[in-house]
Amino acid sequence: MNIRQAKNEIKHTVEAYLKKDEAGDYEIPEIRQRPVLLMGPPGIGKTQIMEQIARELGVGLVAYTITHHTRQSAVGLPFIREEEFAGKTYSVTEYTMSEIIASVYRRIRDSGQREGILFIDEINCVSETLAPTMLQFLQCKTFGNQKIPEGWVIVAAGNPPEYNKSVRDFDMVTLDRVRYMTVEADYRVWKEYARAQHISGAILSYLELRPGNFYRVEADVDGMQFVTARGWEDLSNLMAVYEKLGFLVDEQVIREYIHHADVAEDVAAYLDLYRKYQDDYGIPQILDGCVRPEIYARIYAAAFDERLSVVHLLLDGLAAFFGRAASERALTDAWYAFLKEYRRQVETCLLYTSDAADDLIGV
């Protein structure tokens, strides 16, 4: 499935797990609420869809990348306490609350959201000392001897072994206790997200011409070469700021985000061509309604790649115009609401002052 399908299925799962009957009990008992295990390549938006699901459902979200944790922070620190057994006192080992479980309780306390999603990323890339804890977590929904609070749905994500050398396979016993989903990179789905996030028109134009370069992972003698959706989005954000500052985005800069030599070189060449088209066609003048006659003849005779680039240049300019218009409208609406409330308060104050004056003179 693609990332959009995965989002919808996880969202449906959370809604089903949190559905209650007339008595206020969960329709699916907690013991039957299997954790969701989402496996897919890195950088395709697994964490982002969890944020979207939590926001759309109005539930809490606690997200952790488990590779950043040690066994002590995940399970808790040991301490000694005394207990009496059969008339004798013994020293026994107890554990402090898991940092992850404590974060869930803090979220409940601070937000008032008693239901939510506990998202654990890179769950199959943990260290050898933490691996048994993760198996216990998926099988029993506990960290150490502490359970996940009721009403919190577990979603875990990991990478297939071809993307990460430190991946550990789950055994059949664990897989039989989870909902296993496999997600793949899909440019058509990402393109919808990219438009909503105002990803650079130059990048979208390039990927329309080279969709095969959207997501690539290859191993050669020089090591791993890869391109991910995250890389395209982060590069786009940098390009937007560099353009405002007047800085050039060259091949060296692109290689810092696109870790594939051939693709980075190809993108750099295309960006140079994209900028040339912007100057040659006079895109700002076209958007102002001033089109030179020779422009029609040139675009008519142009190759498909050139036409597509010009279309994206025009769309980029329109998007910037619409963005400015939306910002100005939002600012106007905010000022209108402020002045309306200010006027109401002034009228209330004047009315109160008038009534007080009347009372004072006995009218």
Features from the language model and the residues they span:
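Conserved AAA+ ATPase small/helical "lid" subdomain
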Residues: Q197-I254
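Conserved small/polar residues in nucleotide/adenosyl-binding loops
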Residues: Y352-D359
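Extended alpha-helical coiled-coil/bundle linker/stalk regions that scaffold oligomerization
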Residues: R255-L351
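Conformational gate/switch positions in structured elements
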Residues: S91-T93, A229, D359
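AAA+ P-loop NTPase catalytic core and its hallmark functional loops
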Residues: M1-S205
